[in-house]
């Protein structure tokens, strides 16, 4: 008999459902949940990169996994400011995950971040390093 697949999107689970229980019975946060916790600390008007979040979590080579986490961030509660996470040169590489088109850039501009041709103009000035500036 075939297994019936759930129609619920796994990314729509609340943050509390993202925790695992380890053998000792303690709750353990998932990688995605840790990413969301770091992203929530990004100050208004600042941005960081996927790689900077990965490095802050001690997984320097996991920038793509941070990107995957950001792809589903719009379904997480409390909210995650995914628009503040860009690639290592300030490119809005995740912009196609925002609806309607242009929403990521609009949110950044609203926070005083200049964007030209999908790249943050003042990236070095606006960059927030969670490894050294974590709130």
Task: Give the ranges of each region predicted by the language model.
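Nucleic acid-binding interface residues in structured DNA/RNA-binding domains
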Residues: 2-135
